[in-house]
């Protein structure tokens, strides 16, 4: 089994960068005007600053861990020279440098959110998207060559972006649904509008996740299912698909049942119970998303071909 610490760092990095990208993107397509200013609806500045800085720290730990594993070094300090060599002499190192630059840029840009909220969120979403895309170089696509490599990377990056968009929206709704945030009519109206507005964006995101996920499966495993479920990779993949199905089911319940009920309750001025129902549903969906990210981090360290040959 892969080093649990490496899997944990991968999981933390996936979660952090998806939150950075997805939360900034949510502010662009769901909020309006002054609502994009930190503190008006969501705490953009402290939250995105923290995720950018944590992303920098996790990236440093990640590259040293990879160098330690590849070099066979027994001590952390012994792995540092190997990490420096990886950064300066490999494609993975180039992707890592791009990620670090993007995260520094995001940390600087979000500081201007109170002055230029829309521009700052736009820049953070772009830089966060670049940082998130670099994780593709730590996945299975890095082992391909030629045109296959290009298309595998494209599918990987699309999967990362669409997953980040969904995860960021879930985090945003979780923050907006906190009990102290649904006390005023204005905040409840913003919540109702963003829930309704996310219906179309959510459908597009799910479509991209399914499309890119199928393409990734074909690149990694091929057009077959027999034998895959007998491996650790297959079991984890089935778990991921089951959790994804649960998330789609909860999202459908939110769209077709809970959100319309909440909107009607807002018009009547009786929204406490409806908000509580959506809060529980979103908490389950966010919890499932976190588990999915954990499985993604683990799956990225496994090779179904190698397991099949064992």
Curated annotation (Swiss-Prot):
UniProt KW keywords: Cell inner membrane, Cell membrane, Copper, Membrane, Plasmid, Transmembrane, Transmembrane helix
Membrane spanning stretches: 11-31, 47-67, 92-112, 116-136, 157-177, 201-221, 233-253, 282-302
Membrane-protein topology: Multi-pass membrane protein
One GO cellular component term: plasma membrane
Pfam families assigned: CopD
Record localization: Cell inner membrane
Matching InterPro entries: CopC/D, CopD, Cu-R_CopD_dom
Keyword Iron annotated: no
Stimuli inducing this protein: By copper.
GO biological process: copper ion transport
Family to which this protein belongs: Belongs to the CopD family.
Function: Exact function not known. Involved in copper resistance. Appears to be involved in copper uptake in conjunction with CopC.
NCBIfam families linked: copper_CopD
Protein name, entry field: Copper resistance protein D
